[in-house]
């Protein structure tokens, strides 16, 4: 029996976001160097191995980006790049850890979070609208 058929294709999950223009932050150092210093509005996707919610979040990001263009698109992968994910989450301790999720930052400060609880059980269009509204609110 080929057990590889049960292993999620993490690279494909990563590429769903990088193809959209998200920059992968794979280490804590990359996160600390880029996220806090990013000027303007940043959409941070906290990617996830979770098939159900992750399968909603990534298409939602694609739909949202048809309507809004944050200044920066960045992503970390929870469960894969653990140190990078922990470093990102340390920048917004007011929000409990959640993956998949989206954080909207303005000038390096978190101003909104779309946690897993607002992704799971929703359709990609609804989640995309939440992303659009959060980015627009950050723009002022």
UniProtKB/Swiss-Prot annotation:
Disulfide bonds: none annotated. GO terms for biological process: cell redox homeostasis. NCBIfam families: YphP_YqiW. InterPro entries: BrxB/BrxA. Pfam families: Disulph_isomer (PF06491). It comes from the Bacteria. The lineage of its organism: Bacteria, Bacillati, Bacillota, Clostridia, Eubacteriales. This is Bacilliredoxin STH2395. Belongs to the bacilliredoxin family.
């Amino acid at each position: 029996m080929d057990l590889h058929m049960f292993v999620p294709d993490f690279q494909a999950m990563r590429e769903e976001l990088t193809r959209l223009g998200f920059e992968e932050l794979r280490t804590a150092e990359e996160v600390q160097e880029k996220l806090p210093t990013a000027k303007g509005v940043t959409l941070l996707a906290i990617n996830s191995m979770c098939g159900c919610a992750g399968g909603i979040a990534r298409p939602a990001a694609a739909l949202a980006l048809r309507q809004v263009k944050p200044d920066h698109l960045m992503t970390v992968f929870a469960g894969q790049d653990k140190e990078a994910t922990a470093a990102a989450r340390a920048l917004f301790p007011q929000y409990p850890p959640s993956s998949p999720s989206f954080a909207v930052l303005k000038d390096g400060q978190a101003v909104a979070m779309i946690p897993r609880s607002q992704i799971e059980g929703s359709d990609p269009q609804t989640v995309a609208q939440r992303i659009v509204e959060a980015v627009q609110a950050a723009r002022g």
